[in-house]
């Protein structure tokens, strides 16, 4: 990830919305201006004010994180982003669909760093706790010219928050009636001189939830497995000298999923070191090393079965250089990744490794205040498949008051994974699945145009600010990696084999309207239309929906200009009937009522009624809403700091 104060994003925190209890002003025009000046890094890998970014970027800031009252990344994204949906895969691991792309085509980052491990082509989303997150940046569409493989359909970057107070301790706890779920966590920040420490711990536990009975032969899912999760992270920042900063991090993650007569256990060990050096005015250099090891195993009681052992280990070296030359900013970078995988899905629990090299350059040019253009070029090489990929991106923004116009083209690719190249797996006696060493990389071409208008209503009871955004996109997705029937031959059983298929065309429209009145009323409504042509991105786990929407109507009451006393919101999402060759749900909507009450010194109590109108699927498919009807939750957050 780029940055001077950059390291994934904290540079932007200075312009970010302040905590709810200390919001700087109730004046919506000032808040809107602050949001426009918020520094983002994901779209261009260099710090840039949101209003100046030529690529459409959705930012969920700290204030929105509190309003959404989401306990995990899945809830947050589905409540905020139409066209994005989480369901289950065959092993009841979480499966993503976003604008027609599956989880393998969307790159998730934490402070700009990749995550090791996958299950059914998706990362372990339970690793992405929100306890220490300051904001989330989402770029829809291909971004491989900056981020390489997997950024075919988009990038989601979780960026940690920073605090310079001498010390602070944030405690939180939450109970949900569905599955008797308990979540608890703490974030401890310490600062002394040139050194800052941030320690985060998150814990959750949930019982099994019965959705339907075992005699329901039509449903694919009958219950939601229970389990326990622990997530510990440490982040240490040292300002060594003026212009030189070191950031060290480490983390441990453990999850146990309790199945019917066994349990699956997941471990992750991660660490890294980053150096940020402002060489001189207008020049900076970033160097980093990261390590991530993700393991899976199966237990029957206390006995490890060793028939589901899995370990993915990634070592990544990264370098990034920025140079400002007047109105032109040049960026150059390179990465190396050592990717090692051993899994029960290889013959004889075998092991394979891959070396990946890349280099990229970018030019960011702003000749006049109302125009900005960015162009990027990148080449990647993958040793296992002996493939290389060249990708490019070009984007421009015009500010013609009161409109901002953004135009972009971006190329994307996804290299075959080690699993797709070398798999030799008997899927529970159902069929064999074979890898294909001759696979080619998936490629995509994304075109996007967006119009944005922001303004203010200056008189009357509706005085406040608003924004309107309309964007259209077209994706041509070529050489998509999927499976085909493979006839048996000799000692090789018949089964399914990974292959490349013909192109898929995905096009759509996103529309968003936001409004915030000085009196405290607010609205946020988003709609997505999606059309898929050519081939298909349809499966029993991920099915494109032509229509989807999210909304939130809220009211906040402040005491003076700096203390939020009460917050109430009615939010929801609508999912249209999927276009699919498989049996599916019909269209449905789920509504949520949220109440947040501040008590004393920032202590806040949250109460939520979810699925307000008691929706339940008649049949539970893999991508159905996994709900038993109306449920409720209650939580408390307690911030402590040196002002006590």
Regions found by a protein language model. Give the residues of each.
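N-terminal periplasmic "start-of-domain" segments of outer-membrane beta-barrel proteins
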Residues: 35-68, 95
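Periplasmic-side early beta-strands and strand-to-turn transitions of outer-membrane beta-barrels
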Residues: 145, 157, 164-170, 174, ...
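Extracytoplasmic beta-strand/coil segments of soluble accessory domains associated
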Residues: 42, 74-113
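Membrane-embedded beta-barrel scaffold of Gram-negative outer-membrane proteins
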Residues: 195, 286-298, 399-401, 405-406, ...
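Short acidic/polar hinge/loop motifs at secondary-structure boundaries
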Residues: 113-140
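Structural signature of Gram-negative outer-membrane beta-barrels, strongest in the C-terminal barrel
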Residues: 238-241, 280, 331, 348-475, ...
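Conserved C-terminal beta-signal and adjacent last beta-strands/turns
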Residues: 189-191, 226, 239, 363, ...
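Gram-negative outer-membrane beta-barrel transporters
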Residues: 366-373, 467-469, 473-477, 497-578
